[in-house]
Regions:
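Bacterial N-terminal signal peptides that target proteins for export
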Residues: 2-15
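C-terminal motif of bacterial Sec signal peptides marking the signal peptidase cleavage site
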Residues: 21-25
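Bacterial signal peptide processing site
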Residues: 26-30
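Short solvent-exposed coil/turn linkers within tandem alpha-helical repeat scaffolds
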Residues: 31-35, 49, 84-92, 124-128
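Post-signal-peptide N-terminal segment of Sec-exported extracytoplasmic proteins
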Residues: 33, 40-80
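Generic structural signal for well-ordered, non-transmembrane alpha-helical segments
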Residues: 60, 72, 96, 100-107
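Short, charge-rich amphipathic alpha-helical segments embedded
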Residues: 78-103
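Alpha-helical linker/edge segments of TPR/alpha-solenoid repeat scaffolds
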Residues: 100-126
Length: 128
């Protein structure tokens, strides 16, 4: 084999590899859309209807905090839910969507002067 044919094969292999990576990247899903705050309790209860133990307790904590409009507590509770072991892919996506909506509301509360909401936001920033 000549160095030219080896080099040609190398370039073709690299081009094929690049093409595969590009194609795989094109199939990425869009980021999850947030849900409305009013829908979160129902969605969580439906999505976790068979949950037991700490997962069920975390869902209850989120729903209770939302009903009380306690945004800092809801944010901490949804974060706790997100760290529970054994969540299915659909449950993880639901939690991510709920987290976006809750944290957006908490940001509004912090901007309106809710000191506890601002403290929780600062903790979230430090954890990143």
């Amino acid at each position: 084999m000549t160095s030219t044919s080896i080099l040609g094969r190398l370039w073709r292999s690299l081009a094929a590899g690049f093409l595969l990576v590009a194609i795989a990247g094109c199939d990425r899903a869009k980021p999850p859309e947030p849900v409305s705050l009013a829908d979160i309790p129902r969605l969580l209860q439906e999505g976790f209807k068979d949950a037991k133990g700490p997962v069920k307790e975390a869902v209850t904590a989120v729903v209770t905090a939302l009903e009380a409009q306690d945004w800092p507590k809801a944010s901490l509770a949804i974060q706790s839910l997100s760290t529970q072991a054994g969540l299915k892919a659909a449950q993880q996506e639901l939690v991510a969507r709920c987290t976006m909506a809750i944290n957006a509301q908490m940001a509004e509360a912090a901007a309106a002067g809710n000191e506890e909401a601002e403290q929780v936001r600062q903790v979230h920033r430090m954890e990143k």
